[in-house]
C-alpha cells in the first residue's frame, strides 16, 4: 500500500495504473477533441450535414453535443437530464410548403426516459439550426440502452427503444406509445434495421444481454399495438451479451460481444459464424470500411483494431484513448472513436494514411508523447465520475455472474 497522505487507500497497482493513464492522457494521437464528460455513444448526423462532416455524441454528463469534424466546431444542446445519455438516433423531415427542415435528435437515458431535441432550419440541413424544443418522455422501467428510427410499411417514421428492463417499445416521433414487445431476455443492447429488407416488410434485429439475437418484421404503425409480432428463432453466436450489431454493404452481420470476440455472421448461411476476431477484453463496438475491406473494433482495453475483412488477420492497432473505448462510427475514410476518457478521436483508413500509421507503430520513436491537447471544458465532478464508474463496473460484474450461471 502507498503511505502518501492522499493515496492511503490505494494499492500500488492502482497508483501505477493511474500514473499510466495520466502519462497516456497527454498524447494527441487521433487528433482528440475533449468533451465535458465521459462519452457513451457517437453517430454521424446526415440530417445536419449530408456530407457526413457532423457527428453527435451522447455524454455521461447529460449533454448531446455535435462536432463538425472539418473545423472542430462544437454545437451543444442545453443540458437536459441529470443522468448519463447512452444512445442516439436522428430523424429529419422537410416541410411540403417551404424550404424548412425539422430535425430531431433522440437520446436514450439512464433516467428511463427518451430525450428529444428538436431543431429547425429554413436554409437546409447543412446550415445552422435553431433549437426549438428540449423535452423528454418516460419510456421504460430501467435504463434506455438503444434507439433506432424505422419506417413502417404504411410510411410512418417511428422510434424503437430497447432497455435493460428487457422490453422493446415503439413510439411516434412525438413520443406517443404505439406498443411493446417483451422477449424473454435480460436486457436489450442494440437495435438495427436490416438494410436488405423491403420497405413493405422492414426487418428489425436486436441483440440482448443474454447472448441472443432476434429479428422481427415491423407491422404498420396502426397495427403495432394489436399485432402479435413474431420473433425469429434466436441467433446464438456468442457466449454472453452482444453489445453491438452492424450490417456491412453485403448485408452480412458483424457483432461485438462481452465474450471478447467480434464475429462475422453470414446471411447466405443462415447467420452462421463466418469469422471470429479474438480480443483481450470486452468488444464494445464494430464497424466496417467495405471499400478497402477493413473491419474496425473497439475494445475495453482502450484500443481500436483494424482487421482484414477477408482473412480475419489483425492489420493495425490505433492507440490513443486512455480509458475504455465506448463507440465507433464511420464517415468517409475516417473512423471516429469515443471513450470514457471524454475524448473523440479520428483515424484515417485512406491507404496512404493507414500505411503511415502502420510504419509509425513499427518505430516507437515516432510515437513519442506529444503536447496535451487543449481542454477548456469542465469535467464531471469526482463524485459523478465515481458514481458512473461504479454503475458500469456493477453492470460488468452482473454480466460475468450471468456468464457463470449460463455455464452451469
Where are these regions (language model features)?
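Terminal intrinsically disordered, low-complexity extensions flanking WD-repeat/beta-propeller proteins
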Residues: 2-26, 313-317, 322-326, 331-334, ...
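Short coil/turn segments that connect the beta-strands within blades of beta-propeller domains
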Residues: 51-53, 93-95, 102-103, 156-157, ...
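Conserved beta-strand element within WD40/beta-propeller blades
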Residues: 55-59, 105-109, 159-163, 204-208, ...
Amino acid at each position: 500500500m502507498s503511505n502518501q497522505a492522499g493515496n492511503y487507500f490505494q494499492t500500488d497497482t492502482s497508483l501505477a495504473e493511474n500514473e499510466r493513464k495520466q502519462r497516456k492522457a497527454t498524447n494527441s494521437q487521433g487528433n482528440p477533441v475533449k468533451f465535458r464528460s465521459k462519452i457513451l455513444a457517437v453517430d454521424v448526423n446526415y440530417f445536419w450535414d449530408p456530407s457526413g462532416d457532423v457527428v453527435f455524441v451522447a455524454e455521461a454528463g447529460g449533454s448531446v453535443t455535435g462536432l463538425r469534424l472539418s473545423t472542430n466546431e462544437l454545437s451543444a444542446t442545453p443540458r437536459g437530464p441529470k443522468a448519463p445519455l447512452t444512445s442516439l438516433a436522428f430523424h429529419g423531415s422537410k416541410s411540403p410548403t417551404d424550404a424548412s427542415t425539422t430535425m430531431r435528435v433522440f437520446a436514450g437515458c439512464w433516467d428511463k426516459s427518451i430525450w428529444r431535441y428538436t431543431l429547425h432550419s429554413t436554409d437546409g440541413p447543412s446550415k445552422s439550426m435553431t433549437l426549438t424544443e428540449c423535452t423528454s418522455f418516460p419510456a421504460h422501467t430501467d435504463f434506455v440502452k438503444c434507439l433506432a428510427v424505422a419506417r413502417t410499411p404504411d410510411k410512418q417514421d417511428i422510434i424503437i427503444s430497447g432497455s435493460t428492463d428487457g422490453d422493446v417499445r415503439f413510439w411516434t416521433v412525438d413520443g406517443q406509445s404505439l406498443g411493446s414487445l417483451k422477449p424473454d431476455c435480460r436486457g436489450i443492447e442494440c437495435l438495427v434495421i436490416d438494410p436488405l429488407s423491403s420497405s413493405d416488410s422492414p426487418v428489425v434485429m436486436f441483440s440482448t444481454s443474454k447472448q441472443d439475437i432476434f429479428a422481427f418484421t415491423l407491422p404498420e404503425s396502426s397495427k403495432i399495438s394489436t399485432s402479435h409480432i413474431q420473433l425469429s428463432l434466436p441467433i446464438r453466436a456468442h457466449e454472453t451479451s452482444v453489445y453491438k450489431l452492424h450490417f456491412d454493404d453485403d448485408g452480412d452481420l458483424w457483432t461485438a460481444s462481452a465474450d471478447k470476440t467480434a464475429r462475422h455472421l453470414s446471411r447466405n448461411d443462415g447467420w452462421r459464424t463466418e469469422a471470429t476476431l479474438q480480443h483481450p477484453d470486452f468488444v464494445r463496438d464494430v464497424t466496417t470500411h467495405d471499400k478497402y475491406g477493413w473491419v474496425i473494433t473497439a475494445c475495453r482495453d482502450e484500443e481500436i483494431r483494424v482487421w482484414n475483412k477477408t482473412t480475419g488477420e489483425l492489420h493495425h492497432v490505433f492507440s490513443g484513448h486512455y480509458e475504455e473505448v465506448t463507440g465507433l462510427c464511420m464517415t468517409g475514410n475516417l473512423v471516429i472513436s469515443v471513450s470514457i476518457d471524454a475524448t473523440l478521436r479520428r483515424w484515417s483508413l485512406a491507404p496512404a494514411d493507414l500505411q503511415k500509421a502502420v510504419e509509425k507503430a513499427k518505430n516507437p520513436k515516432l510515437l513519442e508523447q506529444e503536447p496535451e491537447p487543449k481542454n477548456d471544458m469542465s469535467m464531471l465532478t469526482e463524485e459523478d465520475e465515481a458514481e458512473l464508474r461504479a454503475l458500469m463496473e456493477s453492470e460488468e460484474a452482473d454480466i460475468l455472474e450471468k456468464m457463470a450461471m449460463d455455464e452451469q
